[in-house]
A protein has these predicted regions:
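Extracellular/periplasmic metallocenter environments
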Residues: 1, 32-81
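Beta-strand signatures of extracellular beta-sandwich domains
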Residues: 5-9
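Short aromatic-acidic-glycine turn motif
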Residues: 11-22
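Solvent-exposed serine/threonine-rich low-complexity stretches and specific carbohydrate-binding patches
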Residues: 21-27, 35-36
């Protein structure tokens, strides 16, 4: 199955370590204080939902898919104004 998730980071500089650890764990990220919010891994037949409070600090918050080899291209930014 082709799995995907969305992991929103508080600090983009944490991305390499969080991605590396997740890829070593089958794509599932470990609980980490540097993660703002995340969905569980899901396949194309599933829907997942999360609810969270966006940071009050304006900025760009990186989101990535942490499934194996996906983070390089499956990424973007949540913009807080």
């Amino acid at each position: 199955a082709m799995l995907h998730n969305v992991v929103i980071l508080k600090d983009e500089s944490a991305a390499p370590m969080i991605i590396q650890l997740a890829e070593g764990n089958g794509g599932e990220p470990y609980a980490d204080g540097r993660i703002l919010a995340m969905t569980p891994l899901a396949d194309k037949q599933e829907e997942t939902f999360i609810e969270f409070t966006a940071p009050s600090k304006p900025g760009r918050y990186l989101y990535v898919c942490t499934y194996i080899a996906h983070a390089g291209s499956m990424r973007g930014y949540m913009i807080v104004e």
